[in-house]
Amino acid sequence: NIKDTFDQKSLLNPHKIVKPYKLDDRQLLRYKPNYKTENIDTRFDWSNWGNFSDAIEMCNNNGACRELNDGVMCPSYRVTREEKDLVRGRANTLRLALSNQLPKNSFVSKEMFKTMELCVSCKACQRECPMGVDIAKMKSEFLFYYYKKFSMKIKDKIMSNLPRNIWILKLTSPLFN
């Protein structure tokens, strides 16, 4: 280093020329050496990303999802302006749960449901995120496990079975029209 050679005591331009980290320095890495995620059996095929956890980790926190002026990025965030309702917030919450940085069983919890519930599954995140993070698909994966543990609300049961039971509505439509 030229500065170290000519200015060993850092008297010339103190704090103006700094010693950068080496590019392979572990401090620059996003995840610590002991970082690992829980591997869960998923309903969707996540092999394009490696696995479900790897797909979540595609979020690199670049903040493009905070865009309020152009595009359609995350309508729920545009309304609430809260980080938990942001694509990045949801992805990070999922990542923290699957890497056991949140309390045990956080992945399938009421708190995680609150984080995911305002996602309207419009897939704007997948289209507009530079990394293609698909929170709508991740929400579906989460809901599969959530509803195995907690029962579905009646409105959710009706909507999820609508294609199967549409004939009932057709028969009763004269009563409502």
For the regions a protein language model found, what residue spans apply to each?
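Long, C-terminal-biased catalytic regions of enzyme "large/alpha" subunits
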Residues: 1, 88-91, 113
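Polar, glycine-rich mid-to-C-terminal structural blocks
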Residues: 1-54
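A general structural signal for short secondary-structure junctions and capping/turn motifs
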Residues: 2-4, 48-51, 56, 62-67, ...
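Secondary-structure transition/capping motifs at alpha-helix termini
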Residues: 4-12, 66-68, 84, 100-107, ...
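Iron-sulfur cluster-binding cysteine motifs and their immediate structural context
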Residues: 14-16, 58-96, 124-143
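Ferredoxin-like iron-sulfur electron-transfer modules
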Residues: 38-61, 99-121
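Iron-sulfur-cluster electron-transfer modules
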Residues: 103-177
